[in-house]
Structure formats: structure tokens, C-alpha cells
Amino acid sequence: MIQQETLLQVADNSGIKKVMCIKVLGGSKKRYASVGDEIIVAVKDAQPAFGLKDSTGKKVHNKAVQRAVVVRTTKEIRRPDGSYIRFDDNACAIIDDKGNPKGTRIFGPVARELRDKKYAKIISLAPEVL
């Protein structure tokens, strides 16, 4: 479960390494985000010479605000067949306003639940889907 102030790893090659969740999207009462949910993040650690630009055309730097989708959580997720899956870290992928990933590669496994949430592009970039 991801909530405000949670630190996450970035699982793509967008040049951003660590982010902090500042808002969970999906209604005013939504407190926690799970796999497949969109969040607003603040960049905490980015490669300064990387060419990623935000929507206004400026280079991304620390404190920049981005949209992201959660791809891994340490809190287990219950599947419809009764099984559970959990990961070793909390990770997200940076997306644009249309929901497309900004990076061209995804590092590490991602959960199958992303397919149900209409993130097929992230699924296709991932090396392993669990």
C-alpha cells in the first residue's frame, strides 16, 4: 500500500531514481494506492544530465512533479484465485498525461494486475510479468 510520503524506486529508464508519493489519484477519500493505481510523485533523486523533459519542455530535476503508476508493492495483493503475490520493493513507472510510459525500458518484474488496469504498454516493456 502506497500513501502520501511513501518513497518509491522508479522501475524505468526515465532518468529518475527515487520519488516520493504526494497524492493518490482516484477520489478525495482514496488514501492508499496498490498495483495499477496512478499517483502524483515528487522527484527525490534524478540523473542531472539525462534528457527527460516534463510537459512544459523543461529538463526534469529534483523536486519536479510527475505522474506515475505503481508496478510493485511490498504489501501482498490477493488474486481472484485466492493466491497472494508481493514484491521486495515499492516501485513505480513514470507516465505522461495520456498514460503512456516516459521510459523505453522497465526494470524488474511487474504484476499481472496492470493488464486489467489498461497499462498494456508497461506490460510489453517489462522483462517479466508475475
From Swiss-Prot:
This is Large ribosomal subunit protein uL14. Signal peptide: none annotated. Pfam families: Ribosomal_L14 (PF00238). InterPro entries: Ribosomal_uL14, Ribosomal_uL14_bac-type, Ribosomal_uL14_sf. Belongs to the universal ribosomal protein uL14 family. GO terms for biological process: translation. GO terms for cellular component: cytosolic large ribosomal subunit. Binds to 23S rRNA. Forms part of two intersubunit bridges in the 70S ribosome. It comes from Leptospira interrogans serogroup Icterohaemorrhagiae serovar Lai (strain 56601). GO terms for molecular function: large ribosomal subunit rRNA binding; structural constituent of ribosome. Part of the 50S ribosomal subunit. Forms a cluster with proteins L3 and L19. In the 70S ribosome, L14 and L19 interact and together make contacts with the 16S rRNA in bridges B5 and B8. The keyword Iron does not apply. Keywords: Ribonucleoprotein, Ribosomal protein, RNA-binding, rRNA-binding. It comes from the Bacteria.
